[in-house]
């Protein structure tokens, strides 16, 4: 997390977290520290699942799923990056190559994509148990948000990776994410950007809608 003091901006109690783009679950201690009672982890890269499972296996009400989240239902090629998978993405590299020339894609992995609203419907879980969404999917963050459909109204906080130029080809820019979330009364309250034009932002729901 780039925003290390994120908890200062959480003005409502956090119940559960939905974490899309889990990687190896490095944020699990933060969730434990700040009282999240449940965490759903989604990671499409099968190579990372054993590490993720080992990290969260003894944590109560932490579950992981080896699927990708998107607003379309299909199979797709996940481009696996050479930095232990951290920069893996469904999208081709854009200006990321300029700022991180050492990072490249080394192979593809066919993954299954599903929508978050569909996941909650077929899994029988209640999305009302989760009011915090963490999205780190290297360029397809807006697709993840759209996959919630109207269920996005159940959330209080959205913590997302953002970019202000095309770090990945055809990625959504922060202005597009701002505009989409504004439809549901989410306002960006804090942003931390890097010199490479990507960063993190916290969106908080203002009032009721």
Predicted regions and their residues:
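Phosphate/nucleotide-binding beta-alpha loop and adjacent structural elements of enzyme active sites
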Residues: 1-209
């Amino acid at each position: 997390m780039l925003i290390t003091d994120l908890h200062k901006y959480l003005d409502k109690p956090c119940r559960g977290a939905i974490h899309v783009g889990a990687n190896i679950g490095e944020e699990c201690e933060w969730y434990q520290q700040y009282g999240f009672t449940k965490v759903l982890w989604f990671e499409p890269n099968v190579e990372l699942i054993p590490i993720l499972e080992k990290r969260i296996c003894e944590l109560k009400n932490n579950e992981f799923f080896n699927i990708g989240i998107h607003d379309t239902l299909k199979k797709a090629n996940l481009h696996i990056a050479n930095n232990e998978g951290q920069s893996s993405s469904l999208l081709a590299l854009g200006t990321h190559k300029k700022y991180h020339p050492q990072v490249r894609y080394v192979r593809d992995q066919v993954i299954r994509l599903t929508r978050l609203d569909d996941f909650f419907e077929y899994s029988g879980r209640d999305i009302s148990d989760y009011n915090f969404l963490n999205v780190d999917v290297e360029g397809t963050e807006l697709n993840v948000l759209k996959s919630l459909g109207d269920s996005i109204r159940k959330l209080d906080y959205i913590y997302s990776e953002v970019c202000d130029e095309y770090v990945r080809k055809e990625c959504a820019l922060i202005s597009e994410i701002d505009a989409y979330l504004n439809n549901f009364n989410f306002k960006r309250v804090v942003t931390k950007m890097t010199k490479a034009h990507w960063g993190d932002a916290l969106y908080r729901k203002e009032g009721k809608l």
